[in-house]
Protein backbone atom coordinates (compact mmCIF):
# COMPACT_ATOMS: atom_id res chain seq x y z
CA UNK A 1 0.00 0.00 0.00
CA UNK A 2 2.74 2.47 0.94
CA UNK A 3 4.72 1.69 -2.22
CA UNK A 4 1.64 2.13 -4.40
CA UNK A 5 1.11 5.53 -2.74
CA UNK A 6 4.71 6.43 -3.68
CA UNK A 7 6.01 6.66 -0.12
CA UNK A 8 9.77 6.92 0.30
CA UNK A 9 11.81 4.24 2.08
CA UNK A 10 11.21 5.71 5.53
CA UNK A 11 7.48 5.88 4.88
CA UNK A 12 7.41 2.28 3.66
CA UNK A 13 9.21 1.13 6.82
CA UNK A 14 6.84 3.06 9.10
CA UNK A 15 3.77 1.67 7.34
CA UNK A 16 5.18 -1.86 7.43
CA UNK A 17 5.98 -1.66 11.14
CA UNK A 18 2.62 -0.06 11.92
CA UNK A 19 0.78 -2.83 10.11
CA UNK A 20 2.73 -5.51 11.97
CA UNK A 21 2.56 -4.22 15.55
CA UNK A 22 -0.14 -1.53 15.57
CA UNK A 23 -2.88 -3.95 16.58
CA UNK A 24 -0.81 -5.38 19.41
CA UNK A 25 -0.04 -1.91 20.73
CA UNK A 26 -3.75 -1.02 20.73
CA UNK A 27 -4.56 -4.29 22.50
CA UNK A 28 -1.98 -3.74 25.23
CA UNK A 29 -3.30 -0.23 25.85
CA UNK A 30 -6.84 -1.59 26.23
CA UNK A 31 -5.90 -4.43 28.61
CA UNK A 32 -3.47 -2.24 30.56
CA UNK A 33 -0.28 -4.11 29.71
CA UNK A 34 2.63 -1.66 30.03
CA UNK A 35 5.08 -1.24 28.50
CA UNK A 36 3.44 -2.70 25.42
CA UNK A 37 4.84 -5.96 24.07
CA UNK A 38 6.18 -4.36 20.88
CA UNK A 39 8.64 -2.32 22.96
CA UNK A 40 9.47 -5.01 25.51
CA UNK A 41 10.59 -7.28 22.68
CA UNK A 42 11.31 -5.31 19.48
CA UNK A 43 11.87 -8.45 17.39
CA UNK A 44 8.55 -8.06 15.56
CA UNK A 45 9.24 -4.42 14.73
CA UNK A 46 12.75 -5.24 13.55
CA UNK A 47 11.49 -8.08 11.36
CA UNK A 48 8.75 -5.88 9.88
CA UNK A 49 11.26 -3.12 9.15
CA UNK A 50 13.65 -5.57 7.48
CA UNK A 51 10.91 -7.10 5.34
CA UNK A 52 9.75 -3.61 4.31
CA UNK A 53 13.29 -2.72 3.21
CA UNK A 54 13.64 -5.97 1.25
CA UNK A 55 10.31 -5.50 -0.54
CA UNK A 56 11.19 -1.88 -1.31
CA UNK A 57 14.59 -2.88 -2.66
CA UNK A 58 13.18 -5.73 -4.74
CA UNK A 59 10.58 -3.49 -6.37
CA UNK A 60 13.13 -0.71 -6.87
CA UNK A 61 15.35 -3.12 -8.82
CA UNK A 62 12.56 -4.93 -10.61
CA UNK A 63 10.44 -1.88 -11.35
CA UNK A 64 6.71 -2.21 -11.97
CA UNK A 65 5.32 -5.71 -11.69
CA UNK A 66 3.19 -6.88 -14.54
CA UNK A 67 1.24 -9.88 -15.72
CA UNK A 68 2.00 -13.13 -13.93
CA UNK A 69 4.46 -11.51 -11.53
CA UNK A 70 1.84 -9.07 -10.27
CA UNK A 71 -0.74 -11.84 -9.89
CA UNK A 72 1.76 -14.00 -8.01
CA UNK A 73 2.66 -11.07 -5.75
CA UNK A 74 -0.98 -10.33 -4.94
CA UNK A 75 -1.67 -14.01 -4.20
CA UNK A 76 1.36 -14.25 -1.92
CA UNK A 77 0.33 -11.09 -0.07
CA UNK A 78 -3.21 -12.44 0.39
CA UNK A 79 -1.97 -15.74 1.78
CA UNK A 80 0.54 -14.12 4.13
CA UNK A 81 -2.02 -11.58 5.29
CA UNK A 82 -4.59 -14.30 5.97
CA UNK A 83 -2.12 -16.45 7.89
CA UNK A 84 -1.05 -13.39 9.86
CA UNK A 85 -4.66 -12.56 10.66
CA UNK A 86 -5.20 -16.00 12.17
CA UNK A 87 -1.95 -15.96 14.14
CA UNK A 88 -2.44 -12.43 15.47
CA UNK A 89 -6.01 -13.24 16.50
CA UNK A 90 -4.85 -16.14 18.67
CA UNK A 91 -1.90 -14.11 19.95
CA UNK A 92 -4.25 -11.32 21.02
CA UNK A 93 -6.50 -13.66 22.96
CA UNK A 94 -3.64 -15.38 24.75
CA UNK A 95 -2.07 -12.02 25.64
CA UNK A 96 -5.36 -10.93 27.18
CA UNK A 97 -5.60 -14.20 29.09
CA UNK A 98 -2.14 -13.69 30.54
CA UNK A 99 -3.12 -10.20 31.68
CA UNK A 100 -5.78 -11.67 33.97
CA UNK A 101 -9.04 -11.08 32.09
CA UNK A 102 -9.83 -14.71 31.25
CA UNK A 103 -13.33 -14.36 32.69
CA UNK A 104 -14.26 -11.53 30.29
CA UNK A 105 -15.25 -13.26 27.05
CA UNK A 106 -16.05 -10.06 25.18
CA UNK A 107 -12.68 -8.54 26.02
CA UNK A 108 -10.89 -11.70 24.95
CA UNK A 109 -12.62 -11.67 21.55
CA UNK A 110 -12.02 -7.93 21.22
CA UNK A 111 -8.34 -8.38 22.04
CA UNK A 112 -8.02 -11.05 19.37
CA UNK A 113 -9.77 -8.97 16.73
CA UNK A 114 -7.98 -5.69 17.48
CA UNK A 115 -4.64 -7.50 17.37
CA UNK A 116 -5.55 -9.03 14.03
CA UNK A 117 -6.96 -5.98 12.27
CA UNK A 118 -5.78 -2.94 14.24
CA UNK A 119 -2.49 -2.56 12.39
CA UNK A 120 -4.27 -2.62 9.05
CA UNK A 121 -6.70 0.05 10.18
CA UNK A 122 -3.86 2.33 11.26
CA UNK A 123 -2.06 1.66 7.97
CA UNK A 124 -5.09 2.67 5.93
CA UNK A 125 -5.57 5.82 8.00
CA UNK A 126 -1.91 6.77 7.56
CA UNK A 127 -2.14 6.43 3.76
CA UNK A 128 -5.43 8.37 3.64
CA UNK A 129 -7.54 5.39 2.64
CA UNK A 130 -10.84 4.05 3.92
CA UNK A 131 -10.02 1.21 6.34
CA UNK A 132 -10.33 -2.01 4.38
CA UNK A 133 -12.21 -3.78 7.18
CA UNK A 134 -15.13 -1.35 6.76
CA UNK A 135 -15.56 -1.60 2.99
CA UNK A 136 -13.79 -4.71 1.71
CA UNK A 137 -14.23 -8.45 1.95
CA UNK A 138 -14.98 -10.10 5.28
CA UNK A 139 -11.90 -9.53 7.44
CA UNK A 140 -12.71 -8.44 10.98
CA UNK A 141 -15.63 -10.90 10.97
CA UNK A 142 -13.25 -13.72 10.07
CA UNK A 143 -11.03 -12.71 12.98
CA UNK A 144 -13.98 -12.52 15.39
CA UNK A 145 -15.26 -15.92 14.25
CA UNK A 146 -11.80 -17.42 14.70
CA UNK A 147 -11.54 -15.87 18.16
CA UNK A 148 -14.91 -17.33 19.13
CA UNK A 149 -13.82 -20.73 17.78
CA UNK A 150 -10.68 -20.60 19.93
CA UNK A 151 -12.62 -19.84 23.11
CA UNK A 152 -15.20 -22.52 22.34
CA UNK A 153 -12.57 -25.18 21.65
CA UNK A 154 -10.34 -24.09 24.52
CA UNK A 155 -13.14 -24.95 26.91
CA UNK A 156 -13.22 -28.52 25.58
CA UNK A 157 -9.62 -29.32 24.63
CA UNK A 158 -6.02 -28.27 25.18
CA UNK A 159 -4.36 -25.08 23.97
CA UNK A 160 -2.75 -26.22 20.70
CA UNK A 161 -5.85 -27.92 19.22
CA UNK A 162 -7.83 -24.78 20.07
CA UNK A 163 -5.22 -22.67 18.28
CA UNK A 164 -5.32 -24.88 15.20
CA UNK A 165 -9.12 -24.78 15.12
CA UNK A 166 -9.09 -21.00 15.38
CA UNK A 167 -6.51 -20.67 12.61
CA UNK A 168 -8.47 -23.01 10.36
CA UNK A 169 -11.72 -21.09 10.86
CA UNK A 170 -10.14 -17.68 10.32
CA UNK A 171 -8.11 -18.82 7.32
CA UNK A 172 -11.01 -20.61 5.62
CA UNK A 173 -13.57 -17.85 6.15
CA UNK A 174 -11.20 -15.14 4.95
CA UNK A 175 -10.16 -16.99 1.79
CA UNK A 176 -13.71 -18.02 0.93
CA UNK A 177 -14.88 -14.43 1.31
CA UNK A 178 -12.25 -13.36 -1.23
CA UNK A 179 -12.93 -16.23 -3.63
CA UNK A 180 -16.71 -15.86 -3.62
CA UNK A 181 -16.86 -12.10 -3.07
CA UNK A 182 -18.66 -12.31 0.27
CA UNK A 183 -19.35 -8.94 1.84
CA UNK A 184 -21.56 -7.59 4.57
CA UNK A 185 -24.56 -5.63 3.22
CA UNK A 186 -24.12 -1.97 2.32
CA UNK A 187 -26.57 0.82 1.66
CA UNK A 188 -26.29 1.93 -1.95
CA UNK A 189 -26.94 5.67 -2.11
CA UNK A 190 -27.62 7.12 -5.55
CA UNK A 191 -25.37 9.82 -6.96
CA UNK A 192 -28.00 12.55 -6.53
CA UNK A 193 -28.50 11.64 -2.90
CA UNK A 194 -24.74 11.62 -2.38
CA UNK A 195 -24.48 15.13 -3.81
CA UNK A 196 -27.26 16.34 -1.52
CA UNK A 197 -25.58 14.81 1.51
CA UNK A 198 -22.23 16.34 0.53
CA UNK A 199 -23.86 19.75 0.05
CA UNK A 200 -25.60 19.48 3.43
CA UNK A 201 -22.30 18.61 5.12
CA UNK A 202 -20.56 21.54 3.42
CA UNK A 203 -23.31 23.94 4.54
CA UNK A 204 -23.03 22.63 8.09
CA UNK A 205 -19.26 23.13 8.07
CA UNK A 206 -19.64 26.66 6.70
CA UNK A 207 -22.18 27.54 9.39
CA UNK A 208 -19.86 26.27 12.11
CA UNK A 209 -16.97 28.26 10.67
CA UNK A 210 -19.02 31.47 10.44
Residue ranges of predicted features:
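Alpha-helical transmembrane segments and their membrane-interface boundaries
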Residues: 1-106, 132, 136-210
Amino acid sequence: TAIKRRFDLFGVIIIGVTTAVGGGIMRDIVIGSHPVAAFRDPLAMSAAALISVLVFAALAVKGDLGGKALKLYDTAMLMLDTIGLGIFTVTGITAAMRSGVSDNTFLLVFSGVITGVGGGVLRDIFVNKKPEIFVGNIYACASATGAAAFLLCYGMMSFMPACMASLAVTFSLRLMSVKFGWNLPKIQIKARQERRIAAAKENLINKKGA
